[in-house]
């Protein structure tokens, strides 16, 4: 029984580590996003990313380290 609990705890630690590594990769400076401030939904990013104005960027709201961030997709 104790061995089973130890395996579950170890698995949870490994999974949380992998999630942290993935979120760090999302905020990588070499990505196709230009991060421009906080958001709750993608519509919050339209003004800061210049959606519907040349050069017609796309915007999404992605999870960051502490909150959601606007990701202006570079074309």
Curated annotation (Swiss-Prot):
GO biological process: defense response to fungus; killing of cells of another organism
Annotated keywords: Antimicrobial, Disulfide bond, Fungicide, Plant defense, Secreted, Signal
Disulfide bonds: 33-72, 39-61, 45-70, 49-71
Location within or outside the cell: Secreted
Secreted listed as a keyword: yes
A GO-annotated cellular component: extracellular region
Alphabetical list of InterPro entries matching this protein: DEFL (IPR010851)
Record keyword NADP present: no
Broad class of the protein's primary localization: secreted
Pfam families (UniProt xref): AtDEF-like
Signal sequence interval, chain numbering: 1-23
Record-stated family: Belongs to the DEFL family.
Name of the protein described by the UniProt record: Putative defensin-like protein 271
Organism field: Arabidopsis thaliana (Mouse-ear cress)
Lineage of source species: Eukaryota, Viridiplantae, Streptophyta, Embryophyta, Tracheophyta
């Amino acid at each position: 029984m104790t061995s089973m609990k130890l395996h579950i705890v170890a698995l949870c630690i490994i999974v949380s580590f992998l999630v942290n590594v993935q979120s760090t990769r999302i905020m990588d400076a070499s990505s196709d996003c230009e991060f421009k401030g906080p958001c709750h939904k993608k519509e919050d990013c339209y003004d800061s990313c210049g959606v519907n104005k040349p050069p017609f960027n796309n915007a999404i709201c992605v999870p960051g380290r502490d909150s959601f961030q606007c990701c202006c997709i570079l074309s």
